Amino acid sequence: MATIPLFFSLILFLRLYHASRLEKRKEVEGEGIVAAEDLVSENDNPQGDDEVLPVHFIDQAAIVRTSIINYTFRYNEVLDAAKLHRGLLQLLKIPGWNKLGGRLRATKNGKLEIHVPRSFSKTRPEVKFSHVDCSDTEIESHGLASQLPRPTGSTPSIQEGCHAFRSFALPTDLPNNIEHYWKNDQPMLSLHITSFANGTLVGLTFPHSLTDAMGTSEFLKAWSNVVAGKSSFVKPLQGTQVDVLGDVGTNLDKKASQGEFFLEDQQTRGFSLLSFIARYMWDVKTRRSIRTKHIYLPAKYMSHLRQGVEEELKRQNGGVVPFVSDGDLITAWGARMVMSSSTWKNCSAVICNVFDLRGRLKGTFARGGTYLQNLILPATTVLSKEEAATATTAQIALGLRKAIVEQTDDVQSRRLMRIARRWFSSMGSMPLFAKWDSRVVACTNWTKAKFLDAADFGPNALIAGGAGNQKSSSTRKAARHTEPTQAQTQPGRPVMYWGTTLSVTDNPRDTFVIYGKDKVGNYWVHAYLREETWSLIQKELDSFR
């Protein structure tokens, strides 16, 4: 939920209450949910001959459609900016991929559409492209670039967050207001490249309604294949005209309608919903000390964290160690830090883990197909007031794993989608399974997206004969002998990236984004936390040194 003026918060408050009452009445009356057609309006096409593509159901949800997303990749070589731009334009010529060159439109009834020019031109380009040339300056000598996050060996650390590096992410004339895309004939996709003497930063910005993290990963793979001269490897783009989830969770989906979702009876409604919203609004209004920072968790620290968790789980489970993933460990560790903060005393908690529907729904997705849309839902772990106050990292991690197992298989995902359709349609938000006094910890894990692999342009993307690239090559060779705890990269492969939302109204709190790990197991996490939580994390990391 975004940070908005108090008046509009009150309007939203009343709207959500009305929507919850309406939803309850519909369920009592037995009203079914029918499959929604992705209709487009010819009357809202300002150019007349544009190809009009639908924006699909989850993409239309308010929590998604109001967000702008950015990913920025750091390379230790000097890449050819013009070649990257040409490769992107070439990708958009492959059937279906021209969707990336569309314009986002809001129709008179508020529905979003993508309008793709039949032919692109200088006045209507495929992509908003910008290039900043700092090729006479090394990254380490640049005032801002020298502060970019970097590994600190086997020692965990807290470093500057994404928003400090906005100038490397997108051009200065690109507003962080989603209405900019709706009202102007501007491409959805912005490519912003900053070239240094010994490195390159590549920023991609677009409305979140275009796609999610896994879709972005597929886009990056396609783009890098084109740049590498492997256009034949580009997978076909699916679902441009028809929502792959069109029938999922509707009355046409028997798996969804013939039983309840695991947490169905724990949906937040009525007085509990009113109370929850009021508490959240008050927290947003009175506690504004949210700071965005990166957390570097080296493989050595992850091993330490896992050892402690598994020893506790072994004692509690008769010598058997239940499986918990690295994502479970990091999310549980972060949630424990948040719930130990003073503002979290004496309240229950829910932990929302965003999961990807690709591969979970049987018989829904085309084999080998690529989908540029949002295919995400939340898996929810509910903690009572007592559990929130006393649960250990190990207990939370096991609870997270249990929630994922129970809530994300084919049938349960479809039933959650049925509930999500009601919540998206009436309130524009993800389904909420919380108590009146609950606080929410949110986490999204991008490890499976493998962004560092997806954005690997290879040596073909480097400027031929560049002095900076020759120096980078020498640096890599030396690093092999001096930095065994750091992953060594191949030319044209990013060494790090960051991702964040940019909307002017967006102000997440108690939120973690797990970027993933490098080849030797070091993790990067981006978080939006209160000052007191950051202090607790710093103390925790200091105790490991």
From Swiss-Prot:
Upregulation: The botrydial biosynthesis cluster genes are co-regulated by the Ca(2+)/calcineurin signal transduction pathway, which is under the control of the alpha subunit BCG1 of a heterotrimeric G protein. Expression of the cluster is also positively regulated by the cluster-specific transcription factor BOT6.
Where in this protein does the record put region Disordered? 466-493
Pathway the protein contributes to: Secondary metabolite biosynthesis
Q: What is its EC number?
A: 2.3.1.-
Name the residues annotated as catalytic in the UniProt entry. H208
Group of enzyme by EC: transferase
GO MF terms on file? acyltransferase activity
Q: Which residue ranges traverse the bilayer?
A: none
Q: Where is the signal peptide?
A: 1-19
- List UniProt keywords, sorted A-Z: Acyltransferase, Glycoprotein, Signal, Transferase, Virulence
The entry annotates sugar attachment on N70, N198, N346, N445
Entry function? Acetyltransferase; part of the gene cluster that mediates the biosynthesis of botrydial. Botrydial is necessary for colonization of plant tissue by the T4 strain. It is a strain-dependent virulence factor since highly aggressive strains like SAS56 or B05 still retain substantial virulence when botrydial synthesis is impaired, since they produce also botcinic acid. The first step of botrydial biosynthesis is performed by the sesquiterpene synthase BOT2 which catalyzes the cyclization of farnesyl diphosphate (FPP) to presilphiperfolan-8-beta-ol (PSP).
The similarity comment for this entry is: Belongs to the plant acyltransferase family.
The protein in question is named Acetyltransferase BOT5
Organism encoding this protein? Botryotinia fuckeliana
**Gene name as annotated:** BOT5
